[in-house]
Structure formats: C-alpha cells, structure tokens
C-alpha cells in the first residue's frame, strides 16, 4: 500500500544523512572520556566498537533491503515479531530521538555561548532554543527534499573543519604519547566500548525514512557501507590526533578545541567551536527528520492516534507528526526533563540493534520480500547470532540505573499502546454496530 510520501531522497543524499548523524556531537566530548577510562587503549576500544557496529550494520543492510516502507527497525520488528514488539521498538526509538534532540539543543546553546555568552541563560536562551526548533520544523514541513538538501550542506560544512583538524594535527603528533601502560580491566574496557556505541550510532534513525527513498532496496546497503566506512576513518583519526597532540587529554572538557589550540593557536578553538555548531545543527536536522516519521509509521498501523498518519496535501509530509514532535522536543529542551532519557540512549539503541539482527534469520527463513532484496550478508545467520550475543553482552554490562530507566520507558510505552488499541477497537466496534443497525433499517 502506498503511504503517500514523496520519494525524494537518493542514495548519495542518504549517505550524507548517515554521515551527518554518525559523525555527530559525541566526538566533540567522548575522546577525553574514553581516554580517561582506558588510556591509550582507547584506540583499541574504537576499533572493537567499529567492528561491532560494522557487523550490526551488515544485518541492517540486508534486512533494510527487504523493505520500502517508512519505519526502519520498527517495520522490521513488526514483520518478524509482531505488532507489540514493533511498537516497543518504535516507542523506544522515538523517546531516544526526542531526548537526543533536546540534549543536542543544550550542547548547541553551550557552544554558541563561546561566541555569545548571553545565549546560555535567561530569555535569550529560551528564544534561541525556540527559534532553532521552529527553523528545523519549517525545513521538515516544507518537504523531505529540502531537509535532505540541508543535510547535504551541513554534512560538507562540518566535515571540512574536522578534516582540517585531522590533516593539520597529524603533523604535530608526538609518537611518545602512544605508549601503552598497564592494560585496563575487562569491565573498564567494556564500559569504554559501551560508551563508544553512542559515537557510532544514529544510522538506525535515518532508515526510518525508507518510505521517502528512491530505490530503497539498493540505496540502504550502499549508503550504510559507504557512510559508516567514512565515519569510522574520520572518528578514529580524530582520536589519534587528540592522543598524539594533547598531553592531558583525559582531563579535557573540549578535547578537539584544546588540541586545535596546540597546532593552530587561538584560531583553532574558534574554528572547532564554529564547526561544532554546524555539526550539531546538521545532526538536529537528521534527528528531526527521523523522529517525526516514527509516529507517522506507527499511526498507519493504528498503534498511535490516527491523525499522526495524515500527510499534507501540498508538501506531502506528515505535518501532524512533525508538529507533535516539534512541540514535544521544544518542551523537553526548555524544561530539561529529558536528562533521564540521555542515560538510556545507548541501551535502548542496543535493544533496537538486537531486534533487527534477530529479525534477519527469521525473515530469511520466511523468505520475506526476497524478490525485492538486493543485498545478502555472507554467513548471515552466524553473523546475526554473533551480533545478538554482542548486544546482550553490552546490555548486561550497563548500570542497574539504566536498566531501571529502560523499564520505566517500556511500561509507559505499553500503557500508551494498550490505550490506543482499546480506543481503536472501540471505534471499530461502534462502526460495525452502526453498519449493522443501518442494514436492519432496510429489513421488514
């Protein structure tokens, strides 16, 4: 069934969207945090996490190539496991996007404060956050093509300062700073890998927009492989430069800005801070694009109120869903109640990853949509089993407080789901009763 959405995103625009969301704000802070946890073994943690995400991305590439509709992992879970599991996947993804959006808005304001201190507090802060949400909402309302083109521009704009940082920084690296000390504990190394999932994640959100891709069965595998390969190289080189240039990386609050000061002087932090603003804005645009399509996809399946599935007659975008997400994102951004959700961002993503990896052998066995699939993972069944096991390893290594927060989110989601289903069934029953009554009026 056609969803009524315009298929305006090509494979290279999808590559840009994926790079934009993967090379996001996480790399602006995490090089120092990971270095503090495992020292120079942070490079090994980067490589291990990249391999893990690479295997998971292969599963996404095959599963994603079987579908052309909107929903991404939500759609995959519905086909493989049923409506309830699909709702939970979609619900967790949506909450994660809202919380992630609000978090990045705060980071945006903080970096803007480097140039304009008044932006960090008071009415000025409120006005900036509101204006930022309004601009992004307008971009997404006008059309997905405009949103994708905006992502193209900001992908190039934010990669330029990062590439300059890498090229210039490589000439100032001190090999002595890569000396390995005593190996970290297994728990510390696992914690570092767990945190780095945040750096490499986000690609699953973009796949929600498959219903607006041209030839999604071919575009998804191509874009995932190209974008994540590019992101891995960029992120690993950034960590290498930070370690090799900055003596006290572990205690740096702005590692890229501090490192750039070493080899670029005062201009370095200014360039990096400006690049950070560009990076964050681009990532916010991608999150807004993906976040608004999740309620749309779930509403088309009668798991959320049906108005969220309406498509604007002129712009062919889900305007009710966009406005709803914008209002929720603005509220959370201004009130700060999103903080608890930040703690569960990684664990909810890992749960989503596990569901898609587990769906691969099920869809293969059912031969679901094999006529449209254009990509098949070599040794796909063993790879999917390994990925599910890795996800389980990451989940059990998380803190108990994160597990508690995820449980709260799951319970809240199930309540919303149950209420929506009850209301939907009531309307369906009323419609059947009305039809029956109308029919009896014609019987003597």
Task: List where the protein language model places each region.
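Transmembrane alpha-helical segments of multi-pass small-molecule transport proteins
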Residues: 46-50, 115-145, 159-166, 320-328, ...
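Hydrophobic transmembrane alpha-helices that form the core helical bundles
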Residues: 32-37, 45, 54-133, 137-141, ...
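Helix-loop-helix junctions that connect adjacent transmembrane segments
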Residues: 3-5, 40-43, 119-127, 153-274, ...
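Membrane-interface "cap" regions at the ends of multi-pass membrane proteins
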Residues: 1-32, 36-41, 45, 54, ...
């Amino acid at each position: 069934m056609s969803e009524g959405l315009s298929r305006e995103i090509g494979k290279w625009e999808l590559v840009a969207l994926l790079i934009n969301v993967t090379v996001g704000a996480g790399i602006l802070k995490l090089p120092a945090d990971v270095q503090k946890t495992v020292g120079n073994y942070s490079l090994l943690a980067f490589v291990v996490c990249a391999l893990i995400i690479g295997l998971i991305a292969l599963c996404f590439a095959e599963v994603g190539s079987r579908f052309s509709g909107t929903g991404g992992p939500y759609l995959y879970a519905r086909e493989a496991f049923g409506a309830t599991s699909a709702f939970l996947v979609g619900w967790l993804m949506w909450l994660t996007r809202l919380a992630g959006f609000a978090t990045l808005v705060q980071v945006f304001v903080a970096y803007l404060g480097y140039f304009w201190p008044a932006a960090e507090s008071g009415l000025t802060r409120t006005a900036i956050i509101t204006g930022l949400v309004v601009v992004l909402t307008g971009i997404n309302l006008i059309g997905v093509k405009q949103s994708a083109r905006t992502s193209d521009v900001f992908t190039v704009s934010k990669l330029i300062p990062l590439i300059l940082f890498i090229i210039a920084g490589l000439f100032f690296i001190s090999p002595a700073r890569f000396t390995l000390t005593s190996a970290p504990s297994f728990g510390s190394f696992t914690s570092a890998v767990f945190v780095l999932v945040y750096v490499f994640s986000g690609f699953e959100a973009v796949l929600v927009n498959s219903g607006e891709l041209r030839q999604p069965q071919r575009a998804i595998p191509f874009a995932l492989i190209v974008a994540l390969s590019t992101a891995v190289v960029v992120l690993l080189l950034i960590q290498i430069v930070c370690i090799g240039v900055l003596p006290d990386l572990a205690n740096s609050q702005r590692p890229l800005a501090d490192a750039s000061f070493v080899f670029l002087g005062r201009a370095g932090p200014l360039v990096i801070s400006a690049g950070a603003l560009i990076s964050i804005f681009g990532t916010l645009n991608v999150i807004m694009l993906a976040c608004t399509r999740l309620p749309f996809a779930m509403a088309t399946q009668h798991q959320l109120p049906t108005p969220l599935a309406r498509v604007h007659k002129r712009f062919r975008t889900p305007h009710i869903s966009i406005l709803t997400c914008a209002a929720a994102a603005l509220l959370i951004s201004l009130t700060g109640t999103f903080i608890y959700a930040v703690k569960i961002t990684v664990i909810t993503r890992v749960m989503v990853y596990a569901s898609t990896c587990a769906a691969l052998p099920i869809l293969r066995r059912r031969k679901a949509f094999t006529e449209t699939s254009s990509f098949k993972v070599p040794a796909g069944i063993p790879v999917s089993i390994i990925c599910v096991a890795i996800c389980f390893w990451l989940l059990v290594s998380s803190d108990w407080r994160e597990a508690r927060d995820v449980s709260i989110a799951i319970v809240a989601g199930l309540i919303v789901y149950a209420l929506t289903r009850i209301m939907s069934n009531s309307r369906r029953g009323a419609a059947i009763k009305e039809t029956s009554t109308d029919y009896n009026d014609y019987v003597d």
